[in-house]
Amino acid sequence: MKKFTKVLAVLLAVAVFATAFAACSKNGSTSSKVKVIDIALSDEEYAFGVDKNQPELKQQVNDFVAEIKSNGKLDEICNKYFADGTPEGITSATQDPSKDQLVVATNAEFAPFEYKQGDQFFGIDMEIANLLAQKLNKELVIVDMAFDAVLLSVQQGKADIGMAGLTVTEKRAQQVDFSDSYYSASQKLIVKEDDTTFDNCKTKEDVDAILKGFDSSTTIGGQNGTTGQFYVEGSDDFGFDKLNATWKGYANGSLAVQDLINGGVNYVIIDAAPAAAIANSINAVA
């Protein structure tokens, strides 16, 4: 896992370079609209949430995660999104109780882990789901829903597994059985390109000190139900103290960043990989 985490850290560093450079550079002009403050605000582990009534499936998932880590397949998939690989579109079958299917609950608004283009699903989690279904000799069904509904869907037996960039917490583990971790993640801050508030920050503590100094007149946005919300509102489960800033939730991170540009919020906090993907996408058309 340590080697795997280092590989992903390098790949993610490449992915965020363009936005991080804009945050550090003091020379030259830029047409960028936003920048990512390249300081991790949390340390998290992503895992898949399995139906508690299917212990055999959990073991199969754990075996599969170990396999794709050891044979390099997981690195290969990540390279498609963090480096120079070509993402593969995944087509979902129609759900049919009479068939032997693997039903995956996701929220396809969390690139590069899950997103849609037309009728196809893309992303790290979706490509893993496709390989998992093949390994289990099952037909893959992907059900797209609000992030808040993913674990509930699994808990209620409407889906076999949740694959949606899920951070492992004790509270969430009451709803599902988490697989072994497959990805190490963190939260990062997105600001307007011309915002210099955090330019001199070197550590998480530096960023935290500024964030904790804001009052309710400062609004921080992000995706509903994700770690960013708990970072702002506080959570014993995540170990976050409440900020005095006001939280504003959105269906996805892209909407939050767009509202940042439009002046609807002062800052955005979301997971590092989606932060990089969104910032790069928006700045590419700035």
Model-derived segments and spans:
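Sec-dependent signal peptide cleavage junction
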Residues: 18-32
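Beta->alpha turn/N-cap motifs
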Residues: 29, 106-110, 143-148, 157-170, ...
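Periplasmic-binding protein-like
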Residues: 31-58, 108, 183-191, 272, ...
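Ligand-binding clefts/hinges and TM-proximal coupling segments of bilobed small-molecule sensing domains
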Residues: 36-42, 62-99, 205-217, 221-247
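Bilobed "Venus flytrap"/periplasmic-binding protein-like clamshell domains
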Residues: 108-111, 121-134, 184-253, 272-274
